[in-house]
């Protein structure tokens, strides 16, 4: 089932998400719906807060980026209760976009490597060291479960320059190919 994407300005995107337990209701169905919604909206990642749930669940498929970023080849994950344990010292700046911030792309500086622990959809524990763009994708999605957005990492001047676009998103004056929930009313369209 396709789920609507919550847009910038909706309060759920600013909540720090909670860990869940293996008995979370209809978890497999939720993961399948999140994955379907991610693909339908041409995303490479989706976090549960982006569909209105303040829980620590991420779905990622960065494989479509493999031509430009070989480290993304086959990089498909479901990450539950993810926690970044360590961030590398080396930084890299790349453009990022977000389904919750349609039509906005800005340069964001992030560590080039991270160490993350999480459980998969079967609640099997994992710890991985990720590099390059795969690390960037995970950090971007991870921000969502910590109540952050990629625009929180841009300069105040850049944020001022996109203020009009951000206001339009809040007001729902944005076109997308996917269903959205706008702020502050939460009205679906």
Swiss-Prot record:
Protein biosynthesis is among the record's keywords: yes
Free-text remark on how the cofactor is bound: Binds 1 Fe(2+) ion.
SUPFAM superfamilies: Peptide deformylase (SSF56420)
Name of the protein this chain belongs to: Peptide deformylase
HAMAP family in alphabetical order: Pep_deformylase
Keywords: Hydrolase, Iron, Metal-binding, Protein biosynthesis
Family membership noted in the UniProt record: Belongs to the polypeptide deformylase family.
Cofactor: Fe(2+)
Superkingdom per UniProt: Bacteria
The organism's taxonomic lineage, starting at the top: Bacteria, Pseudomonadati, Bacteroidota, Bacteroidia, Bacteroidales
CDD domains: Pep_deformylase
Enzyme Commission (EC) number: 3.5.1.88
Catalytic residues (positions): 141
Gene Ontology biological process terms in this record: co-translational protein modification; translation
Positions bound to Fe cation: 98, 140, 144
Reaction(s) this enzyme catalyzes, per UniProt: N-terminal N-formyl-L-methionyl-[peptide] + H2O = N-terminal L-methionyl-[peptide] + formate
Broad class of enzyme this protein falls into: hydrolase
The gene coding this protein: def
Function as written in the Swiss-Prot or TrEMBL entry: Removes the formyl group from the N-terminal Met of newly synthesized proteins. Requires at least a dipeptide for an efficient rate of reaction. N-terminal L-methionine is a prerequisite for activity but the enzyme has broad specificity at other positions.
Recorded GO MF terms: metal ion binding; peptide deformylase activity
């Amino acid at each position: 089932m396709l789920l609507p994407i919550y847009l910038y300005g909706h309060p759920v995107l600013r909540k720090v998400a909670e860990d869940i337990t293996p008995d979370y209701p209809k978890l497999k169905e939720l993961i399948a719906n999140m994955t379907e919604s991610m693909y339908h909206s041409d995303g490479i990642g989706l976090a549960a807060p982006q569909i209105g749930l303040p829980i620590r669940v991420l779905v990622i498929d960065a494989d479509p980026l493999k031509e430009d970023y070989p480290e993304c080849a086959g990089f498909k994950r479901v990450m539950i209760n993810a926690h970044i344990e360590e961030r590398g010292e080396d930084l890299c700046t790349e453009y990022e976009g977000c389904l919750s911030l349609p039509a906005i792309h800005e340069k964001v500086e992030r560590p080039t490597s991270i160490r993350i622990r999480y459980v998969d959809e079967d609640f099997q524990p994992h710890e991985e060291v990720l590099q390059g763009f795969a690390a960037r994708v995970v950090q971007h999605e991870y921000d969502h479960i910590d109540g952050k957005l990629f625009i929180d990492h841009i300069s105040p001047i850049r944020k001022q320059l996109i203020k009009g676009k951000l206001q339009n998103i809040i007001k729902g004056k944005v076109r997308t190919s996917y269903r959205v929930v706008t702020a502050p009313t939460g009205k679906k369209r």
